[in-house]
Amino acid sequence: MRALRRWTFGTLAALAMLAGAFVLWATLKGRPQDLPWTELDLADPPGLFTGRKLAGLTHDFPRCEALMKRAGVRYTVLPEMRDGEHCGYADGVRFAGGGSRRVDYLPADLRIACPVAAGLALWEWNVVQPAAIRHFGKRVSAIEHYGSYSCRRIVGRGNGNWSQHATADAIDIRAFRLADATRISVKQDWKGGDPAREAFLREVRTGACRLFTIVLSPDYNEAHADHFHMDQSARGEFGWRGCW
């Protein structure tokens, strides 16, 4: 019994020391985004807890709006919408032109929940554009999508859980257009044989995993062979996350 107590005490002490070392490291590095209790700032590069902080914006529309405005993201607030018992949104926005974003979404009539919009802005600045410059020497000018809001259950589960699309907390990304009109498609280029296109798509998928609760790609199943599903599921700041 004494040996067990000594082992338990030693383990807890070691964990406390590791936690203290981590806090010191993050503080000295000047990266508050790597700490779970610091405030989210969209001007900061993504950190270890950025994705969880974005998910924590679900059901906190005023805080999400304040962050978007401070970051220079222009948008229009959509009227609250209710579509039956399980569908609708109270934090819907539509991106507006200008401001700190430079990417157009096609089609332009994209209704998304505010936490999804915040995640997309960070994705553009810190993942998509750097990857495009690295692989093609050009910026992305537009991102094509299959939409966000859709009052439905998860595909393939007729009687199962409701999709995050039912509350505009998800978006399906299908392609990227570069400044020279080059089009990079998830369906055609995920395994299309062009190393640069394949590497770009995998890089933006993996980067999205740091910013969204669930990210599904062609690696997940056939239903996602032509798009990336990216959502901000309402699991809070410490809930389960998934990336495929």
Predicted regions and their residues:
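Active-site-adjacent substructure of cysteine-protease-like catalytic cores
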Residues: 134-168
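Short extracytoplasmic/periplasmic juxtamembrane "stem" segments immediately C-terminal to an N-terminal membrane anchor
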Residues: 35-56
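Hydrophobic membrane-insertion alpha-helices, especially the h-region
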Residues: 9-27
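Catalytic cores and adjacent binding grooves of peptidoglycan-active enzymes
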Residues: 9, 13-14, 162, 169-244
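Active-site acidic/histidine clusters and adjacent loop/turn architecture
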Residues: 53-143
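Extracytoplasmic/periplasmic, Sec-exported soluble proteins
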Residues: 52-60, 112-120, 124, 162-168, ...
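N-terminal Lys/Arg-rich, disordered targeting/topogenic segments
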Residues: 1-5
